[in-house]
């Protein structure tokens, strides 16, 4: 409710109406973020230091008159880095056994996702029948990506004949010793906010303002997960996801000084939802190396790759969607 501060452009737009002179402001920030992960007796640290422009803005104050009802018309602009997604995570170690002594492996999740398809009436062969570039298994709502990757990399048991016997579909990790697992993840991006304001001063007692907000959102995550076994068998799963888009909102504000002889101020602001239009793009790549039998019954080492690009015309899988945030209301008092 006090107003007269650049930050009010994004909270109560009427606060810019209290300015009686021009103003320019900018601030820089230094961030130091760190992540520590501990697993299986191994500790991993990731640190990142970064300088950045946190916010900048200006106000142009236009005096109308001393005796007129409308005293000032002010214009403002502000840039603010409202959200940062920067984060790096690393961890690795020997995966634990379950309380009953069973091996833990992500291949079980692949098998479970495929098993869910069976519960919905789809035969496991459905993946194989659709796993061609023309049929595009990665653009099929009936097939989970982990199920498709695991099938292509031979990472779960394909022998499934009895629909009532769910135990026959399981990850190949069940037949091997504990795997040594590694996970690396890097996230970047943020939300840049641009606010454009016009505000009015009436009789130095009533202040009204409107702010139009524009948002630029970008987020990128790349990760790799791997399991290595003492037998020499392994698999590496790489994934990449990017979300970007724009949004807008409106903010309406009022500040009232009810008593001419008192500095008491009452502030009220309403923020509409922020309306985002976003695009998600993603791709995955899996490489596996396992032992299997050839047509002659001999044991061979098979190296297999599964790339979503091969099924999507060398493109990312993309999905457009809209997001709307809630309404916001702000009531404040200042003295």
Give names to the regions the model predicted.
Residues 3-11, 17-95, 189-192:
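Outer-membrane beta-barrel translocator/receptor signature
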Residues 11-12, 252:
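A generic local structural motif
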Residues 61-335:
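Outer-membrane beta-barrel porins/channels
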